[in-house]
Amino acid sequence: MRPYVILNAAMTLDGKIATATGSSEISGEEDLRRVHELRRECDAIMVGINTVLADDPRLTVHRVDAAPGDNPVRVVVDSMARTPPHFRVLNDEAPTVIGVSESAPPERVAELRKRAEVVVAGTRRVDLHLLLERLHGMGIERLMLEGGSTLNYSMLTGGLVDEVRVCIAPMIVGGRDARTLVDGEGIDEMADAIRLELKRSYTLGEDLIVEYTVKG
Ligand SMILES: NC(=O)c1ccc[n+]([C@@H]2O[C@H](COP(=O)([O-])OP(=O)(O)OC[C@H]3O[C@@H](n4cnc5c(N)ncnc54)[C@H](O)[C@@H]3O)[C@@H](O)[C@H]2O)c1
Ligand SMILES: Nc1nc(=O)c(N)c(NC[C@H](O)[C@H](O)[C@H](O)COP(=O)(O)O)[nH]1
């Protein structure tokens, strides 16, 4: 058993979720409120370690009203336990789970255990199936996946995503080194693409929101 997973992201019209230099303010004000409402409805928010290192996110509900207990559990996928102990994802605003692999240096794991629950899953990379199973065992039934591109790819190709919600902002930045909604190794044949079904589309200010379910 695993949680129901909603992938949420904001991208430019050309599919970038950050520029090559890591600048990533894409969503408009209204979309950011939508994101935080979605955070409030979920039991956990999951991101990859590169997103933590790039943005130092809080991963809490802070743009809409929230009672202290409304903050979801924060989950970082971090094979080598590189989450810096002073980063905001480890503050006391919400509980945090760090998913590491068996290859993570024990001294860094011990340091993280002072501030978070550490789940060891996988030998070199985090085994996402196993991590999600463990999260479900902790009572997490609805999980919001907030990127980045590399984790999005692994989660989608692992068959671990149920819905995709994307904010398309009216911006274009280009750049072959800029992260896109989904990177990773990529699928070779279009016939093998992950198929989605469009459920809803609407505008929020200048942004276009598109919501899909992933076909099983
Ligand atoms: N616009 C948005 O909605 C949005 C959202 C999130 C992140 N971002 C941006 O995305 C960028 C980071 O994306 P990224 O692709 O570099 O990194 P990421 O956040 O997807 O982290 C990927 C890393 O996670 C670790 N990992 C461990 N096990 C893994 C597994 N099984 N599968 C995949 N990764 C695994 C690896 O170290 C891997 O390099 C940042 O610039 C950030 O600002 C944008
Ligand atoms: N929906 C969305 N629109 C954006 O324009 C953007 N840059 C992100 N990025 C998601 C990523 O996880 C960010 O790191 C957090 O949004 C940081 O913000 P918080 O401190 O957690 O509120 N997400």
UniProtKB/Swiss-Prot annotation:
Provide the assembly information. Homodimer.
Pathway of action: Cofactor biosynthesis; riboflavin biosynthesis
- Catalytic activity of the protein: 2,5-diamino-6-(1-D-ribitylamino)pyrimidin-4(3H)-one 5'-phosphate + NADP(+) = 2,5-diamino-6-(1-D-ribosylamino)pyrimidin-4(3H)-one 5'-phosphate + NADPH + H(+); 2,5-diamino-6-(1-D-ribitylamino)pyrimidin-4(3H)-one 5'-phosphate + NAD(+) = 2,5-diamino-6-(1-D-ribosylamino)pyrimidin-4(3H)-one 5'-phosphate + NADH + H(+)
Top enzyme class: oxidoreductase
Its EC number(s): 1.1.1.302
Q: What does this protein do?
A: Catalyzes an early step in riboflavin biosynthesis, the NADPH-dependent reduction of the ribose side chain of 2,5-diamino-6-ribosylamino-4(3H)-pyrimidinone 5'-phosphate, yielding 2,5-diamino-6-ribitylamino-4(3H)-pyrimidinone 5'-phosphate.
Q: Which organism is it from?
A: Methanothermobacter thermautotrophicus (strain ATCC 29096 / DSM 1053 / JCM 10044 / NBRC 100330 / Delta H) (Methanobacterium thermoautotrophicum)
Q: Which domain of life is it from?
A: Archaea
The record ties this protein, via Gene3D superfamilies, to:
Dihydrofolate Reductase, subunit A (3.40.430.10)
Q: Spell out the InterPro entries in the cross-references.
A: DHFR-like_dom_sf, Rib_reduct_arc, RibD_C, RibDG_C, Riboflavin_Biosynth_HTPR
Q: What is the lineage of its organism?
A: Archaea, Methanobacteriati, Methanobacteriota, Methanomada group, Methanobacteria
**The protein's name in its UniProt record:** 2,5-diamino-6-ribosylamino-4(3H)-pyrimidinone 5'-phosphate reductase
Q: Which family does it belong to?
A: Belongs to the HTP reductase family.
- List UniProt keywords, sorted A-Z: NADP, Oxidoreductase, Riboflavin biosynthesis
Q: Where does NADP(+) bind?
A: T51, D55, S79, M80, A81, R82, V126, G148, S149, T150, L151
What Gene Ontology terms describe what this protein does at the molecular function level? Answer: 5-amino-6-(5-phosphoribosylamino)uracil reductase activity; NADP binding
Q: Which GO terms describe its biological process?
A: riboflavin biosynthetic process
